[in-house]
């Protein structure tokens, strides 16, 4: 049986953290960020983990965070942008709850991410490299149960769209 978590996935700048916090508040649920699970365990920020241990170690820590999610139920979870993009990860996330892909125009996503700062996967990459990264991740994101376009929308409007998509999906399941 699938846990009743709501799991937000998407590229950097999609709004997973800000939307996740608001969504959790609206649903009366706890909010969990996989990056927070990692930083709490390691005692250092994500950029520092990348700098000192590299991406490979960070991805290992993400795998541990996914395992920790198995203990969660009824929560709103925001994943790191690359977390679902490993073999078998999206399948695991789908078993832990309803996975919602927050998608958007790539230029807008990158602009949001740059404004937020401290993005190791964005630093020192050309626009072409960022686009290639997005295109490589997109097939994984497409495996989400639901997809919500965030282009041109603030967090409140995205939350409204996510809630509507969740209601529609719940109603469709009830009809089966």
Task: Report the location of each language-model feature.
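Hydrophobic anchor at the beta1->P-loop junction of P-loop NTPases
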Residues: 8
